[in-house]
Amino acid sequence: MATTNSLHHHHHSSPSYTHHRNNLHCQSHFGPTSLSLKQPTSAATFSLICSASSTSSSTTAVSAVSTTNASATTAETATIFDVLENHLVNQNFRQADEETRRLLIQISGEAAVKRGYVFFSEVKTISPEDLQAIDNLWIKHSDGRFGYSVQRKIWLKVKKDFTRFFVKVEWMKLLDTEVVQYNYRAFPDEFKWELNDETPLGHLPLTNALRGTQLLKCVLSHPAFATADDNSGETEDELNRGVAVAKEQAGVGADKRVFKTNYSF
């Protein structure tokens, strides 16, 4: 490059020196065969050299920008779920549940963030990657006992019957009455925030059903969880275990079962 700059500087002041430098320039770039041709470096040659240099610089710049953008995207993805992961790592399931609700609002879009809650119609706009990231953290840090995909399997096993689902994950409790009655647990004190052998599968995370079950239905039906093994698991008798045990304890028949459908917490 220094040879090229020197040649450009003396182009007008010393023709003979320029001719000599041109030959050296050709030799350095094209080898001894080009030297015997004694072709002077033309303006077109300069243009070609500059163009090649410019193209190389542009390619490097584009590559650098692409790498920067990719790094920024990765960093953003890595940090949006950090708080949730921290709570789960430390087994702070109550805080993790609250953070999950906050994340669900955040990933549902700006309108949901301004509103402070999610419309069930907005769930379909959530990217599968975001829901899977949340779900994977719950599964990883609960030994596979918590998470949306765990809840989905239970929901499908009870043929999408939400009353049976709520009994199965113990979001409902058996009332001490003459007939078998279930009512929603009081939030937050009556829910189970510790992971042990007594904690039912799919108990967390909670999904507010104050405005009905459509939000939960849309979450469990999201394509993010479509690859789950929907056909594996317990038999129908095992799925009815919660109801059957309650019936046996109360000593009444199925025709006397009463479910209270207050799905709020």
UniProtKB/Swiss-Prot annotation:
Question: SUPFAM superfamilies, from UniProt?
Answer: GUN4-like (SSF140869)
Task: State the compartments where it is located.
Answer: Plastid, Chloroplast membrane
Name one cellular component (GO) term.
Answer: chloroplast membrane
The main location class comes to plastid
> What are the BP-aspect GO terms?
chlorophyll biosynthetic process; chloroplast-nucleus signaling pathway; positive regulation of catalytic activity
Q: Which residues cross the membrane?
A: none
Q: Which GO terms describe its molecular function?
A: enzyme binding; tetrapyrrole binding
Q: Keywords in UniProt for this one? A: Chlorophyll biosynthesis, Chloroplast, Membrane, Plastid, Transit peptide
What is the induction note for this entry? Up-regulated by light.
Subunit text: Interacts with CHLH, the protoporphyrin IX-binding subunit of Mg-chelatase. Monomer or extremely compact dimer.
Q: What is this protein called?
A: Tetrapyrrole-binding protein, chloroplastic
Q: Which gene encodes it?
A: GUN4
